[in-house]
Amino acid sequence: MPVRHTTVYDSPLGEMLLASDGQALTGLWFEGQRHAAAGLSPDATPRDDLPVFEAARSWLRSYFSGEKNVEPPALRLEGTPFQGCVWDALREVPYGSTVTYSELAARVGRRLGRATSARAVGSAVGRNPVSVIVGCHRVLGARGELTGYAGGLWRKRALLALERDGVVAREATERPAALVAALVDVWERSVRATHDFLLPGEVERLRAVVPDALEGVPRLLVAEADGTPVGFLGADGDFVEMLFVDPGWRGRGVGRVLMSRATEALGAREVSVNEQNPQAVGFYEHLGFSAYRRTPVDDDGRPYPLLYMRLA
């Protein structure tokens, strides 16, 4: 049956295109995703009120709110018999779990009664027409590394963080006073936990200017758990102006989720970091940044050396 209807959903990870034949969901792609709109009829028309679209939007709202085991809308996945077998195997990978391409290939091989390669399975995974609901983001490389996600590795990392820890990362296009106040609190907790080199009174002095910095930075990414901010990143062009994570959430991938989105989706390539904060320096080095300039004082002329780092 031709795919004749479309609608759009604004997810925390960007706009998504939904497609349907009128009865079932046949496509769900992130903006800019490889193979997006595959099989879409040239005369497909927007139709927001289709019941299956309403069901899909409801599922997506629940999913991005951290709800588990929500009944998905009706699906119709159109592909080759081999692709269909791979997609069926994907649907059996539970929420919050992961599988390697080799493990998935073994499962598909058992279904087919013959051996199949991880490469062939990977190709079919990449052609999955219904992202998120059919969990191709749960497939990892042989050593557990993130590889090959048609919607972008930063989205794969974000989806896995959502399922693992309930962390949702979004761009804050609006910055109400309550959000700014919550982020200032995250900033202070983070600074007090990591910036023990600051002189007395510096935290209070700096806190007074953080609200203006948050409101003025062009791009602001916010990581939340149960609706509460646990980290944030601000970027201006290719420069990361700020990155702070609540100390209770350090070591759980929040900073990595934010930086991955900043570098891959926003084009950020540079950052400055306090030289006296070795954990932060090591974090950026681990992500592939290297120092190219040092200043003996910070931007305000205070005695806090800065390292300017660039993504290799």
Where are these regions (language model features)?
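Conserved GNAT-fold acetyl-CoA-binding loop/helix
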Residues: D185-P211
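Conserved GNAT acetyl-CoA-binding A-motif
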Residues: E264-Q276
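A short beta-loop-alpha structural element at the N-terminal edge
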Residues: V168-D185
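A short helix-loop-beta-strand connector motif used in the catalytic cores of GNAT acetyltransferases and
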Residues: P211-V222, F239
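Conserved acetyl-CoA-binding loop-helix of GNAT-fold acetyltransferases
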Residues: V245, G251-E264, G282-H286
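Conserved active-site alpha-helix within GNAT-family acetyltransferase domains
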Residues: R256-V257, Q276-P305
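Basic nucleic-acid-binding alpha-helical/helix-turn surface characteristic of O6-alkylguanine DNA
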Residues: M1-L112, L162-V168
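Conserved beta-strand in the GNAT
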Residues: V222, G227-F244
